[in-house]
Design a protein with these regions (language model features):
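Helix-loop-helix hairpin linking two adjacent transmembrane segments in secondary transporters
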Residues: 133-178
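Helix-breaking motifs and short loop linkers at transmembrane-helix boundaries and internal kinks
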Residues: 37, 69, 90-96, 236, ...
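Extracytoplasmic gate region of multi-pass secondary transporters
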Residues: 208-246
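Paired small-residue
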Residues: 84, 95-103
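Juxtamembrane intracellular "pre-TM" segments in multi-pass secondary transporters
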Residues: 182-209
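Helix-to-loop junctions at the C-terminal end of transmembrane segments
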Residues: 59-69, 256-268
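Conserved MFS/SLC helix-loop-helix module at the cytosolic interface between two early adjacent transmembrane helices
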Residues: 56-92
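Cytoplasmic helix-loop-helix junction between adjacent transmembrane helices
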Residues: 100-138
Length: 290
């Protein structure tokens, strides 16, 4: 295996790790409620706030990523994760825990953006498709493994175990990135974000699609956040098992992506969208009623 391939796999694992950070502690939300003795709303707010900050970082950093030192930016992101993970693991104060978790989101937002940019630069024209496919596999695996890993660690060592685990992994990755050669992305070679023309902001189709995407992900993450509490309070399912029950949701998302590739070759995109939205609404209502 060449040094270039090793770098590609390291970058892919960095993207996996960033997604792991985001999803790993969702299964222990009921336990956090007991640990910190604060309203469940504030526990859930750390989940929503984390995702919001990650999204903002993509917008803020995406415009200038090409002109920055890639290695320094990656080390900065990992450094933020190290500091915040240490504080989250050590503190018993919810305010400090929440601030550190939201601070962690900044590092989590930096890592995947830089890794994607570097993957596009380091891979050759012939190998770029394979590199992007591997990147997508890493991203797809994280939401599937994170709840299981989080519930396993959380059941035994609570949130301290989860953030200690993140601390150790982030330190190892920091040292690896520090000692390997990471090239800079030359300005203008890779452009991840295109300027959105003003006409799109008043286009009804564009606004409709963005709104639909927002509502779908709002529902998706609402269910993810609510599921641990539902399983614990209604069905008396412990943290150790609840993480496994996240797996069907993640697998369904992956299968949906695979099915779309096949369906798009046979059916019109608008028809697929209509059927998908209708089915999503029906099954969401069934989830609430049943």
């Amino acid at each position: 295996m060449t040094n270039s391939n090793i770098r590609l796999y390291i970058l892919g694992f960095l993207a996996f790790f960033a997604s792991l950070i985001q999803n790993i502690y969702t299964p222990i939300i009921p336990r956090l409620y007991d640990d910190f003795q604060v309203p469940l709303f504030w526990i859930n707010a750390t989940v929503g706030g984390f995702i919001f900050i990650v999204a903002v970082m993509q917008i803020v950093l995406g415009r200038s990523i090409d002109s920055r030192d890639s290695k320094k930016v990656l080390l900065t992101g990992l450094g933020i994760v190290i500091i915040s993970s240490f504080i989250c693991a050590m503190t018993h104060n919810f305010i400090l825990f929440a601030i550190s978790r939201l601070f962690q989101a900044i590092g989590c937002g930096i890592i995947p953006l830089v890794t994607l940019t570097l993957l596009a630069k380091l891979s050759t024209d012939n190998g770029r498709a394979q590199a992007m496919a591997n990147y997508q596999i890493f991203l797809s695996c994280a939401p599937a493994l994170a709840p299981i890993l989080g519930s396993t660690l959380g059941a035994r060592w609570d949130y301290i175990g989860i953030f200690s685990f993140l601390l150790v992994i982030s330190i190892v990755l920091f040292l690896i990135i520090f000692f390997i050669d990471i090239p800079n992305v030359e300005k203008g070679i890779v452009k991840l974000t295109e300027k959105i023309e003003e006409k799109y902001l008043i286009d009804k189709v564009f606004i409709t699609l963005v709104t639909l995407g927002f509502l779908i992900f709002l529902t998706y993450f609402s269910i993810l956040v609510y599921l641990p509490t539902l399983l614990n309070n209604t069905y008396d399912i412990g943290v150790g098992i609840s993480g496994v029950l996240f797996l069907p949701i993640t697998v369904s998302v992956i299968l949906g992506s695979l099915f779309y590739k096949r369906l798009s070759k046979k059916y019109n995109e608008i028809m697929i969208l209509r059927v998908t939205i209708t089915g999503f609404a029906i099954f969401t209502l069934l989830f609430g009623w049943l």
